[in-house]
Amino acid sequence: MTNQHSAPLTYRDAGVDIDAGDALVDRIKPLAARTMRPGVLVGIGGFGALFEVPKKFREPVLVSGTDGVGTKLRLAFDWNRHDTVGIDLVAMSVNDILVQGAEPLYFLDYFACGKLSVDTAAAVVGGIARGCELAGCALIGGETAEMPGMYPDGEYDLAGFAVGAVDKSAIIDGKSIQPGDVVLGLASSGAHSNGYSLVRKILERAGARPDQDFHGQPLVDVVMAPTRIYVKQVLAALDRHGPAIKGLAHITGGGLLDNVPRILQPGMAAQLQRDGWEMPKLFQWLQQQGSVADAEMHRVFNCGIGMVLVVAADQADAVAATLREQGEIVNRIGEIVPQQDGMAQTVVV
């Protein structure tokens, strides 16, 4: 006689739905197909993805980066906004490898959850595919992990991995930066994917609702605006101006104060002008609602500057003009100076 303890069990009984996983793959394949580019030999579906480095690179150096979206995901869950965090995921990695002069070639993602919702996962991957299109890289693989008991229902985690290439002679390392060079800032779309633990704390203090009006837009649209992807615009500037662009910094966790020093040699400092750009209304509101000090704002948030370029002074106007042609909002936000005793490597004055 069979009892409940000897009845046949299935993977579905344990909480893993193979059919849902297969359905998701079917939804993903056409999304990934839109991102294909020359060089992809084997994409989604194989045990490993294959990519041939473009022949235009004479001495190719591969540049890799990996990242997540951080606690911005908490708001995605709470506010049911899943279609843009995939763009964030791509942006965080491709912008990171861009700063060394690399052209992103391909991207892979990791999506982990406790119970797979095909619709939610497809919305996330749709954002990833859109991010890859914006960056010009191929979505050639990924992993979807349904792990019962590991995540609450409706929640998930994301990680992404980007690989790009740059000619060895064209690697940007900041070593040629010198006093007198100009610091240009490219506008961000908002908080991007950093500082969201503080953002959430301020939203809680303010009693904010996702549907409340914020200067003519729903607050959710402003707070969840996807991270800007600067790849095509900056690559166009590098192609035209080459060595005039001496350093690039992606302004992520640590804000301006911690990220700009990462491209400076000892003895160099970036002196940024507080009035060199207008801090967007979102950051003004966050600072006011949270009573956040200026220094804390500059070391947590991008404060409206998502990418920094250090360029030769005599080429600054030309580089800025090229970036504006590509649709960028460009501000001249400071200059490189000799670092004085006791001076931080990046200061806002």
From Swiss-Prot:
Coiled coil: none annotated. Keywords: ATP-binding, Cytoplasm, Ligase, Nucleotide-binding, Purine biosynthesis. It comes from Bordetella parapertussis (strain 12822 / ATCC BAA-587 / NCTC 13253). Its main location: cytoplasm. Its EC number is 6.3.3.1. It is an enzyme of class 6 (ligase). GO terms for molecular function: ATP binding; phosphoribosylamine-glycine ligase activity; phosphoribosylformylglycinamidine cyclo-ligase activity. Pathway: Purine metabolism; IMP biosynthesis via de novo pathway; 5-amino-1-(5-phospho-D-ribosyl)imidazole from N(2)-formyl-N(1)-(5-phospho-D-ribosyl)glycinamide: step 2/2. It is found in: Cytoplasm. The gene is purM. It holds the Pfam family AIRS. Belongs to the AIR synthase family. It catalyses: 2-formamido-N(1)-(5-O-phospho-beta-D-ribosyl)acetamidine + ATP = 5-amino-1-(5-phospho-beta-D-ribosyl)imidazole + ADP + phosphate + H(+). HAMAP family: AIRS. This is Phosphoribosylformylglycinamidine cyclo-ligase. GO terms for cellular component: cytosol. GO terms for biological process: 'de novo' IMP biosynthetic process; adenine biosynthetic process.
